[in-house]
From Swiss-Prot:
<dbReference type="InterPro" id="IPR008806">
    <property type="entry name" value="RNA_pol_III_Rpc82_C"/>
</dbReference>
<dbReference type="InterPro" id="IPR013197">
    <property type="entry name" value="RNA_pol_III_RPC82-rel_HTH"/>
</dbReference>
<dbReference type="GO" id="GO:0005737">
    <property type="term" value="C:cytoplasm"/>
</dbReference>
<keyword id="KW-0804">Transcription</keyword>
<feature type="modified residue" description="Phosphoserine">
    <location>
        <position position="392"/>
    </location>
</feature>
<feature type="region of interest" description="Disordered">
    <location>
        <begin position="381"/>
        <end position="401"/>
    </location>
</feature>
<protein>
    <recommendedName>
        <fullName>DNA-directed RNA polymerase III subunit RPC3</fullName>
    </recommendedName>
</protein>
<comment type="similarity">
    <text>Belongs to the RNA polymerase beta chain family.</text>
</comment>
<dbReference type="Pfam" id="PF05645">
    <property type="entry name" value="RNA_pol_Rpc82"/>
</dbReference>
<dbReference type="InterPro" id="IPR055207">
    <property type="entry name" value="POLR3C_WHD"/>
</dbReference>
<comment type="subunit">
    <text>Component of the RNA polymerase III (Pol III) complex consisting of 17 subunits.</text>
</comment>
<feature type="modified residue" description="Phosphothreonine">
    <location>
        <position position="27"/>
    </location>
</feature>
<keyword id="KW-0963">Cytoplasm</keyword>
<feature type="compositionally biased region" description="Acidic residues">
    <location>
        <begin position="429"/>
        <end position="444"/>
    </location>
</feature>
<dbReference type="InterPro" id="IPR039748">
    <property type="entry name" value="RPC3"/>
</dbReference>
<keyword id="KW-0597">Phosphoprotein</keyword>
<dbReference type="Pfam" id="PF20912">
    <property type="entry name" value="RPC3_helical"/>
</dbReference>
Length: 654
């Protein structure tokens, strides 16, 4: 696989140096001097990525990333021409730092004249690692299985923080500063755990290679390998080349995740260790799987209750590491623009979810991992309310005076005494209850019994939301390909309802369910006043949640001769919502940095070594109040950013 990737990186492109079309649309001056409001309408990605990189690497790195996001791939010479105040050396130095943190990818191309040029692309994966850096550390510490909680968690946090800040590192380099043998053994075992859990993977050329170019190289290679005198038609040749390219592409993509490439056995201790010279980096996809699980757990809480959601949480955590990727690399190649390819990709994804080993589970598997404090007894109804009503009705009927019975000779049989009839009735009711609840009594002894867990799994499988699918009796799996669109729709409706009101969500659902509707149909189905419907529709159109489609009645295209219908296009709506959330996150970061700049003198004074811990003595009352205000506003920014991030990532997931 290294040979394949090496060929892709050194492949000669005979097409020459191509010009970037987007360069005509946005000039460098526009990019560098653009205001926050204009950035929202032009490119929210540009605004967010520049603010993130500026906060971590400074102004120069932000300028380089801004150019790459706005104009696409650029060479060093082109970057120098477009960025004022930076020469070749400063651009190269900045690119080295960005490449080290995986914020930039590169590819070398050779023109017809033989001149080699290296082009640089921005890499959103590295930028997202900077965005999630604190959450990555917190998530890994939570998931790690360690003996000494405090000490080992601190070591794990230091390891992950070093990997994020350096981009990648080797175990040999990390242990070079450790003197104690016992500490070296502990750190080495923690590295093994991080690799086994999938949070650390081997860094390779793949992390610096553009996916689109890699796919294009593999496809052209296999297409050219087919003999020209082959009797196959051009369509079959392309289909065959595509299949072979997919096979090689999957092998290259999955290679960094293979533990055999990372772990080995120490001959001295016979224990598994990480190869000392292997460079390790953060596996963002593994972390995002955990974020996806949290989103699904929160959705389950709102739909099936908190107890069933806790059972669902164990099921997700059990299969999380082997679950499908958040975004399949094939979706980034442009291959799915073909409708047939998109459909076959969807079918294949559903098959993989069902057939992949480690993704199916049953109640016994979950019982081994349920926490001791979770008691499932009493979490399910033992009898339907309708049964009680029927029983009370029958008892009431029995209490009514019955018809008198006579013998042949006319003797009237007297009724039983009240005490005797009541005793017989109570004994009958007790017997019925014992028969109905006989099976449930066995479950009350074990809080984690398989039957109770299976009942909760059936609730998840029978829900309107496809939380689980049952392949065979008692065996389940999580259908991510069907569940993620439902999650997106649910979160989108929540945002619409919380910002525009419940009436907007009602209209949005009405239009989505009816596909393409007129205002007359909306008036008859939405059960709202006509004035309210029009004002709400205007808000939905402004937020790109609803679109207007003109349908001409005749050949005359004048407005008076046309009918205007409404429809919802989910792709456009989700994309607009994602960009809106992106801009709001970037705006929060922008305000935070601006706040620090305005109070830079006070912050420098408060951060001095001789002032720390003695602020009340050495700072004026006005300075203390100002410092308190700065800290409170910064905490407020982080809280709002966390909420926006949890919404934004839903629309980022494929």
């Amino acid at each position: 696989m290294d040979e394949l990737l090496g060929e892709a990186l050194s492949a000669e492109n005979q097409a020459g140096e191509s010009t970037v079309e987007s360069e005509k649309l946005v000039t460098p001056e526009d990019v560098m001097t653009i205001s926050s409001l204009e950035q929202r309408t032009l490119n929210p990605d540009l605004f967010l990525y520049k603010e993130l990189v500026k906060a971590h690497l400074g102004e120069r790195a932000a300028s380089v990333i801004g150019m790459l996001v706005a104009l696409g791939r650029l060479s060093v010479r082109e970057l120098v021409e477009k960025i004022d105040g930076m020469d070749v050396d400063s651009v190269k130095t900045t690119l080295v730092s960005l490449t080290q943190l995986r914020c930039v990818k590169y590819l070398q191309e050779t023109a017809i004249s033989g001149k080699k040029t290296t082009y640089y692309y921005y890499n959103e994966e590295g930028i997202h690692i900077l965005l999630y850096s604190g959450l990555i550390i917190d998530e890994i510490i939570t998931q790690m299985r360690v003996n000494d909680e405090e000490e080992h968690k601190q070591l794990v946090a230091e390891i992950v923080q070093n990997v994020i800040s350096l981009g990648s590192l080797t175990v040999e380099d990390y242990l070079s500063s450790v003197t104690s043998d016992s500490m070296k053994y502990t750190i080495s075992s923690l590295f093994v755990q991080l690799c086994e859990m999938g949070y650390l993977i081997q860094i390779s050329k793949l992390h610096y290679t553009p996916i689109e170019d890699l796919w294009q190289f593999l496809y052209e290679k296999h297409y050219k390998n087919i003999p020209r005198n082959s009797p196959l038609s051009d369509l079959k040749k392309r289909s065959q080349a595509k299949m072979n390219a997919k096979t090689d592409f999957a092998k290259i993509i999955n290679k960094p995740n293979e533990l055999s490439q990372i772990l080995t056995v120490d001959p001295k201790t016979s224990l598994r260790i990480v190869k000392p010279t292997v460079s390790l980096t953060i596996n963002l996809d593994r972390f995002m799987k955990g974020r996806r699980s949290k989103q699904l757990i929160n959705l389950a809480k709102t739909r099936v209750g908190s107890v069933t959601a806790q059972v669902y949480k164990i099921a997700l955590r059990l299969t999380e590491q082997k679950s499908p990727k958040i975004r399949d690399p094939l979706t980034q190649t442009g291959l799915l623009q073909d409708l047939e390819e998109a459909k076959s990709f969807q079918d294949e994804a559903e098959l993989v979810e069902e057939k992949t080993p480690g993704l199916t589970f049953n109640a016994i598997d979950l019982a081994r991992h349920l926490p001791a404090e979770l008691d499932l007894r009493g979490s399910l109804l033992s009898r339907k309310p309708s049964d009680n009503k029927k029983r009370s009705g029958s008892n009431a009927a029995a209490s009514l005076p019955s018809k008198k019975l006579k013998t042949e000779d006319g003797f009237v049989i007297p009724a039983l005494p009240a005490a005797v009839s009541k005793s017989l009735q109570e004994s009958g009711d007790t017997q019925e209850e014992d028969e109905e609840e006989e099976d449930l009594d066995a479950d009350t002894e074990d809080p984690h019994s398989a039957s109770l867990i299976n009942s909760h799994l059936k609730i998840l499988a029978s829900s309107n939301f496809p939380f689980l699918n049952e392949t065979k009796p008692g065996v389940y799996y999580v259908p991510y390909s069907k569940l993620m669109p439902v999650l997106k729709s649910s979160v989108y409706e929540y945002v619409i309802a919380s910002t525009l009101g419940p009436s907007a969500m009602r209209l949005s659902r009405c239009i989505r369910d009816n596909k393409l509707v007129s205002e007359k149909i909306i008036n008859s189905t939405a059960l709202m006043k006509e004035k309210d419907i029009r004002s709400t529709l205007a808000s939905l159109i402004r937020y790109n949640s609803v679109e207007i489609q003109e349908v001409p009645r005749t050949a005359d295209r004048s407005a008076s001769r046309a009918v205007f219908l409404f429809r919802c296009k989910e792709t456009h709506s989700y994309n607009f919502m994602r960009q809106n959330l992106e801009w709001n996150m970037a705006n929060l970061l922008f305000k935070k940095e601006k706040l620090k700049q305005e109070n830079s003198t006070l912050l420098k004074k408060a951060n001095r070594d001789d002032v720390k811990g003695r602020e009340n003595e050495l700072l004026l009352p006005s300075e203390l109040n100002q410092l308190k205000m700065v800290n409170e506003r910064e905490l407020n920014v982080f809280a709002r950013l966390s909420r926006l991030l949890s919404l934004w990532e839903v629309f980022q997931m494929a």
